[in-house]
Amino acid sequence: MARKIICFGPGPQFKGGIANYNTALAKVLDSKEGVEVFLISWTQQYPAIVPREFIDKKSKLDFLEGTNVKVTYITNYNRPKTWNETFRLIKEINPEMVIFQWYNAHQGIPLHKIAKKIKKHTSIEIVFDLHFVVPKENSSVDKKLTKRGLRIADSYIVHANKTANELKEIFPNQPFFLTENGTRTAEKNQKTIIKLYHPIYTIFEPKNDFDVEAFKRKHNLEKYVFLYFGFIRKYKGLHHAIEAFAKLTEKRDDVSFL
């Protein structure tokens, strides 16, 4: 009988690193023999007051092509009714575990509700894959939502010792068991922290016919190119990179910043 695993987080129709990560995780798990993978996704990830469009309308790639991953878009941040629908779907699938992607403190509200129902009505393992613990903006509201959202979990995945230490700081009275091989603690009062290196994505492949020099000529780029890729947010440090690059251009004329 196949092991069932649910990857909860933004599906492949969304843009952004977390959507890519969750999709890549589902794809890799699907490649394992005897594993049946379900990807349950948001339809809307953030409060309605957030104006940004997160749907990827440009990419024509199907990152899950050729897999058996079953994708369902169901969870709407702004419609609590869908939180209950999400729980019922998870209960119906009855997986061995649900891996929740944790990357925004405000999602602690719906995720807490969903995880709490799973904990109360099933024996499914609840795993939170932590892309951070301490919010970058670090407001008191974010801290409360983070603590509320994460406390239901049975196990946690972290990608740095710093993240594990932050988790211990917000739950100072909770005993933890830290492992790097996925072993779960046998102690009832402990929760497991699984430390894994951040993986290299397998959903992207280089274009063998990509002409690097032609691209540089078209975009007036110099020999050496420094690339910033991703959303522009203060904590990502783009302003520091620009300042550092400005100093570099005082000494060299063969560099570009893209």
Where are the predicted features?
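Short N-terminal targeting/anchoring amphipathic segment
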Residues: 72-76, 86-110, 124-127
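Carbohydrate-associated surface elements
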Residues: 162, 182, 199
